[in-house]
Swiss-Prot record:
GO terms for biological process: deoxyribonucleotide biosynthetic process; embryo development ending in birth or egg hatching. GO terms for molecular function: metal ion binding; ribonucleoside-diphosphate reductase activity, thioredoxin disulfide as acceptor. This is Ribonucleoside-diphosphate reductase small chain. Heterodimer of a large and a small subunit.
Length: 381
């Protein structure tokens, strides 16, 4: 029965006695209820379709986002530069078990309350942030990008981000003995407003159905290239002081990984046909810089561990300029790097930290080309 037929029957039965037609009335009401649910579902589906078409229209002609018949097979390679990034990621694979935290507790127990507070909150931020990056990769980027080489990279990045999250969680579990405080740190997004603010900014880009792929790509390049930069620098400051060897070793590995992820985002952006205006990129980057500066100079000031807040603010601007140049834009802040100990740490394009890593950080044989694999009996030994 249609909705109109049901309503007509209801009108006919309106004057009838209740006992005689009560069962029919109940049936009609149930059927009417079902039809209303169906109508609501159809309306919601139509609205969702409209939203999807709006999203698709923004990126409709972007080749990298279009379905490809051969996207399930990697060879023959079509994007050798993207593939090279994937192989670099594989070569740099590491596990939490490789990081020795045995000597850290002596340093931790010698630190004052401010230093312990600062480090624990930085670790809490990192533990949550890697999960947010993965949320974006799983929900959006790896589903949208159809280029096989890029999908390989994203698949491996998800695994690496999981290792980062595990590492930070292990650091918290090792340093923080009080269970209540530990649980508070594991729920940092809900417990600390200054961490929630950064998380909300990143999450907004995941849920924004109207933002173009290019905008979201820039936003997450800012997450990994700006939101992490000051926190990395604060931990490297501890290394300069000869403290926390396990923490600083993991920081070296993770900052190298994130530098690679940031550079990959810039490479992918360079391949997009529909690029953003320089002003739009500036708007996204300025937003991220302001949040990061507030985070490390007001909400969780680095002077708690003996760093200079003004110089940290300058360093964040320097990092932002580096990202802008990689994206093909002019520098916005023109700030110099105030921290000599951060020269070559996944930031300076002249000497990439990935290329300077010690040999044990790289998986053997992964980046070796075919010519180097050949065994020559006439070679000099």
């Amino acid at each position: 029965m249609t909705l109109t037929e049901i309503q007509n029957v209801e009108k006919e039965n309106a004057g009838a006695s209740v006992p005689k037609h009560s069962s029919n009335k109940l049936k009609l009401e149930k059927e009417l209820e079902k039809l209303e649910i169906v109508d609501q579902t159809k309306a919601a589906s139509a609205e969702e379709t409209n939203n999807e078409s709006e999203v698709n229209e923004l990126d409709a002609d972007e080749p990298m986002l279009q379905d490809l018949d051969n996207r399930f097979v990697i060879f023959p390679l079509k994007h050798h530069d993207i593939w090279n990034f994937y192989k670099k990621a594989v070569a740099s694979f590491w596990t939490v078990e490789e990081v020795d935290l045995g000597k850290d507790m002596n340093d931790w127990e010698k630190m004052n309350g401010d230093e312990q507070y600062f480090i624990s909150r930085i670790l809490a931020f990192f533990a949550a942030s890697d999960g947010i990056v993965n949320e974006n990769l799983c929900e959006r980027f790896s589903n949208e990008v159809q280029v096989s080489e890029a999908r390989f990279f994203y698949g491996f990045q998800i695994a690496i981000e999981n290792i980062h999250s595990e590492m930070y969680s292990k650091l918290i579990e090792t340093y923080i003995r009080d269970e209540t405080e530990r649980n508070t740190l594991f729920n940092a997004v809900d417990e600390f407003e200054f961490i929630k603010k950064k998380a909300d900014w990143a999450l907004r880009w995941i849920s924004d159905k109207k933002a173009s792929f290019a905008e979201r790509l820039i936003a997450f390049a800012a997450v990994e290239g700006i939101f992490f930069s000051g926190s990395f620098a604060s931990i490297f400051w501890l290394k300069k002081r000869g403290l926390m060897p396990g923490l600083t070793h993991s920081n070296e590995l993770i900052s190298r990984d994130e530098g690679l992820h940031r550079d990959f985002a810039c490479l992918l952006y360079s391949k997009l046909q529909k690029k953003l205006t320089q002003q739009r990129i500036y708007d996204i980057i300025k937003d991220a810089v302001a949040i990061e500066q507030e985070f490390l100079t007001e909400a969780l000031p680095v002077d708690m561990i003996g760093m200079n807040c003004r110089l940290m603010s300058q360093y964040i601007e320097f990092v932002a300029d580096h990202l802008l140049v990689e994206l093909g834009c002019d520098k916005l802040y023109k700030s110099k790097n105030p921290f000599d100990f951060m020269e070559n740490i996944s930031i300076d394009g002249k000497t990439n930290f990935f290329e300077k890593r010690v040999s044990e950080y790289q998986r053997p044989g992964v980046m070796v080309n075919e010519a180097e694999r050949q065994f020559d009996l006439e070679a000099d030994f």
